[in-house]
Structure formats: C-alpha cells, structure tokens
Amino acid sequence: MMNNKVSFTNSNNPTISLSAVIYFPPKFDETRQYQAIVLSHPGGGVKEQTAGTYAKKLAEKGFVTIAYDASYQGESGGEPRQLENPYIRTEDISAVIDYLTTLSYVDNTRIGAMGICAGAGYTANAAIQDRRIKAIGTVSAVNIGSIFRNGWENNVKSIDALPYVEAGSNARTSDISSGEYAIMPLAPMKESDAPNEELRQAWEYYHTPRAQYPTAPGYATLRSLNQIITYDAYHMAEVYLTQPTQIVAGSQAGSKWMSDDLYDRASSQDKRYHIVEGANHMDLYDGKAYVAEAISVLAPFFEETL
C-alpha cells in the first residue's frame, strides 16, 4: 500500500513536531480530492499499532487516512515524554486536521475522525469542539476521565478517585525536585498485574510480540492524573455532538459502558451502534475477524457521511 511518513509542526505548539503516516487509496491520483479520516491511537499506543491497522484498512476502501503519534509520545516531539494530557490529546486531532487542510488532494469539506480506546473518546471531544469534523467513528471507546474515576467496569464511585488527584499533584512537586518524571501504567506492565483476562490481553498487546512497539512503553507521566481525573471526553455532547456518529464495541468488553454512554449522550440525529458479538475490548485492536467486521461497518458509514 502506498503511504508517506510525514512530520509537521503542531499548530497548537510550534515547538512540537508531530509524526504521522498518510495512507493512500488504491489508484491514488494526486490531482483529485479525497475524503480523509484522522486516526487517533489509544492511551499508551502509537501510530504503528491498532490506529495504523484501521488507517490501512480504511485507505483500502478509498479514503486518504492519517495515523499520528500524539504530542509527547511515539515519534512526535515534546517533553516530558509520555505526557497524557487529555486536553492536548484532543487538540492534537484538530492540529492534524490543520495539516490536512494544506494538502491539495484532501477535500476540506469531507474530513472525518476515528479513534480506538482513549483515542475514540478524544475523537468525540474533538468533534464537539471542531466543526470541520463531519463524521466520527469509535472503536472500543474509552472516556479516559470516566475510566480513571469509575473503574474498568464502572463500579467505583468518583469520590474514591480523589487520592489520584493528590497523587498527580504530589508527582508534580517530586518531578521538579528530583528532575525525573514519575510514571504510571496505562496497561498492566506485568502479566501478574492484570486483574482479569481482558486486561491480561492489554498487557499482552503492549508488552509481547503480539503488538509491542519500541516507542510505546505502555505508561504515562503520573502528573497526567491532574488532568485525567476531572476530564470528560463527552462534555456537552448532549448539545454539540451533532455530527453523524458510528460506535463499534464488543459485546464482551468491560469498557462497553462507555460506548453506551456516548450513544446516549450524543445529540446526533444520525448515530449508530454496532456490537461485535463475542469480542472484548482488545479483540477489536487486532483480532482479524473482529477488525474486519468493524471495517465493514465503518467504511460504508464514512462513505455515506463524508
């Protein structure tokens, strides 16, 4: 497949260069204008993993797609490394769209966005704020604020996450005094750390040959908790998320409640929900049959709505 690795200045922060790969459809003609889709990776992931998988497969269906590394992560610039600030992650999507609008072969009126896991939540938030996004797709959606407040299966009270806010605050002080940034796992760092099979697969995805990648260590800066805990990826979705929305989630995903929540809260007149029977959260990252089913829903959705 024809692709082009690019690096461009983040329009929100000119000191940061964003690294991305653009995938082109079959028989690409640079004199034409194409529908384009921005792909956002999970928390702790990079463009070479599941975001790249979906970018390639959607490009095969006729779209120009771009998978990128978030600021402070992967091959993109920024210090401290592995900062997971949800507000910056959301703004990165708009920065990538800024870049797309400079490409002659992209139709600026037909740009969509899609994300996996936390990248899906960031995609929803970006669409709430950025009207250039004409349609969104989500796969195994995670509202990162909700999951840190309420747990993987939504069985923890928000007030019980207050110690995390304190931990993030204390980390900022220790970071400055020690000169080293404290970190926290975004997926289990060891197999024995996983509380269930689904999260054991998250460890397997990020830390074994299944999908591990050198620029995806699977952790974030501990100071990120200050922004994560109070963040709501779906804030004002009831009012401003009016774009067509296609949600895809596995029937066995512990995270499915966050896809349910997005569907309930989105004000879109055209919102669709496809459940992949038998799939858990991680299956939709790289399970061949499950990903194929997701693409069979997402590709026609974007073709229709962009």
UniProtKB/Swiss-Prot annotation:
GO terms for biological process: cell division. Disulfide bonds: none annotated. Pfam families: Peptidase_S15. SUPFAM superfamilies: alpha/beta-Hydrolases. One of its GO terms (molecular function) is hydrolase activity. This is Uncharacterized protein YcjY. The lineage of its organism: Bacteria, Pseudomonadati, Pseudomonadota, Gammaproteobacteria, Enterobacterales.
